[in-house]
Amino acid sequence: MMKGVSYASNTGYKSDEYNKLVNEAKAMPEQNESWKKFAEAEKLMLEDAYIAPLIQSGMAYMQKEYVSDMFKFPTVPWSYKWADVDKEKKQLNLISTSDIPTIDPSKATDTVSFEVMTNTMEGLVRIDKENKAIPGIAESWETSEDGLTWTFKLRKDAKWSNGDEVTAKDFEYSWKRTLNPETASQYGFIMHDIVGAKEYNLGENKDPDSVGVKAIDDYTLEVKLVRPVTYFDKLMAFGVYLPQNQKFVESQGDTFGTTAKSTLYNGPFTLSEWKIEDHYSMTKNPTYWDNSAVKLDEINTKIVKDANSALNLYETDAIDRVGVTSENVDKYKDSKEFKTMKDSSTYFLQINAGNPQK
């Protein structure tokens, strides 16, 4: 579904009708009704716009049979909290085609960064193997009858890797830092359903206190929305909504999130080593509140840009998972280790027509 995409219209007026349908969809209190309205908008776009759908993507990969409980979903990065390997050394070996651009939740935009943050940090909730939102830093949460106010109750045993407690203030600070126009976060828009967030993010209102996220006390976070968002609890697992320790972030300045030591962690693992364009390692976090559920001691990731080199590493048992490119699918598709997965990305061609640049 291409929600919120603008387009050049063949007829010159249907783009307004499309935008009207999208705005109506966003205002629907029931998710099923919202999807129906989005479907109407999508149908109108495909019939009227200079847009041609191309592909809906997926992925194929190989994974060793001794690896278990390592999973991801289309909108969630690989999660290793519950992962295990059936061998004496509890170590997972992986590759990545690129290095980590940043581990600053306010500035990350890519899958590598989000994967590292998902496993070294924790938000209000975590997504489990059944794609359900389960307690993370929040022990429980509730919504108001009109669906516009969410209240999260935080656990009292969550700590940062420097020993500080993780509090509701860490979430309020983090979200407002992301929305601050000076941060220039590319993902600030994802918070626009929060009262005052859009106006603050776009610089139309310079008062951060106008944003509807507030630490009522150290262990209670209140969020006010402009419309009911039925999936808001799941959204809390997304990397942009992770907490940040204000004192630490400000002490690091521009180096925050750029090295293993210039970042704090509150998740199942810590980033223990990071050698740029070579490798990085995550180690089990002894201060994580649910440390007993973490089975792996270490996750090592080597930067390997060539797909065939990566496959060679897999075949020689140097790594435990590897992506399979389309030209190699036939070679491996009958293997017990071959797996496929749907992706949430849809690619389309948008032609610059009807509105020439001046």
Please provide the spans of the model-predicted regions.
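Extracytoplasmic
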Residues: A49, K89, N119, G136-A138, ...
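Immediate post-signal peptide segment of exported/extracytoplasmic ligand-binding proteins
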Residues: W82-I95, D164, Y265, S292-D297
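Bilobed periplasmic-binding protein-like "clamshell/Venus-flytrap" ligand-binding domains
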Residues: P29-K64, L94, T230-M236
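Extracytoplasmic/periplasmic ligand-capture domains
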Residues: M1-L44, D48, I127-K129, D146-T151, ...
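Surface-exposed ligand-recognition segments of extracellular binding domains, strongest
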Residues: S68-D69, N131-K159, F189-K247
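Gly/Pro-rich hinge or "lid" segments in bacterial periplasmic/extracellular proteins
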Residues: A108-T111, K129-K132, P208-S210, D218, ...
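Long beta-strand-rich cores associated with HINT superfamily self-processing modules
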Residues: M2-V5, Y61-Q91
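N-terminal lobe/hinge region of extracytoplasmic solute-binding protein
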Residues: Y61-M62, I95-E145, L264
